[in-house]
Regions:
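Compositionally biased, intrinsically disordered low-complexity regions enriched in proline and serine
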Residues: 6, 21, 90, 123-126, ...
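Glycine/proline-rich, positively charged
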Residues: 29-31, 36, 101-173
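Residue-level signal for alpha-helical context at structural boundaries
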Residues: 77, 91-92, 144, 170
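Structural motif corresponding to the early beta-alpha repeats
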Residues: 81-104, 129-132
């Protein structure tokens, strides 16, 4: 079959209508600790390559997925694919859910770690993760009062974030 793509009306990105979510990945027993399961990176790499073969070019991850290992796994899979960075889109999130992560410095570190783990110098789509959690008060604490949103806007202006948005889980109240 042939993949269908949609062109983003504001930035011209030609994105596959099927994206690959990196929230749940194949697992295996850890050879060093049989009581622990780890990501089966070999299988993940195979699935990533298969997704590329079918025309998928949009990959969604988060620092919170797979016990914090999702971004690193995606970075490895994309690197081993041999594809050029401009041939796919990475969406990740600023997943600063815990009050211990609400400082400007913690948010900056989370973003810098995402770049490192994903083996890239820019993020195509960065989402403020689940902004509905805790209502407007937590939104202010996570992104506004600490200056993090302003800093992220600076990163966008510098080209380190191509598109900045949010994800929301909750009701309209």
């Amino acid at each position: 079959g042939k993949m269908t793509y949609r062109t983003h009306p504001h930035n011209g990105d030609k994105v596959s209508i099927l994206g690959y979510g990196w929230m749940r990945l194949p697992r295996m027993k850890n050879p060093d600790n049989p009581n622990e399961e780890i990501i089966n990176q070999e299988e993940v790499n195979r699935l990533c390559n298969k997704a590329f073969e079918y025309g998928v070019n949009y990959f969604d991850t988060s620092p919170a997925y797979c016990q914090g290992k999702s971004e690193e796994s995606l970075g490895i899979a994309l690197e081993q694919s041999g594809r050029s960075r401009d041939s796919y889109y990475i969406a990740t999130k600023l997943s600063n859910f815990s009050p211990t992560q609400w400082s400007l410095e913690a948010g900056q570190q989370m973003f810098e770690n995402s770049l490192k783990y994903l083996k890239t110098d820019y993020i195509d789509y960065l989402l403020l993760h689940s902004i509905g959690g805790g209502g407007l008060d937590n939104l202010r604490k996570r992104y506004l009062d600490n200056g993090l949103l302003a800093w992220l806007m600076e990163q966008r202006a510098a080209g380190r974030i191509r598109n900045l948005g949010f994800s929301f889980h909750g009701d309209v109240k």
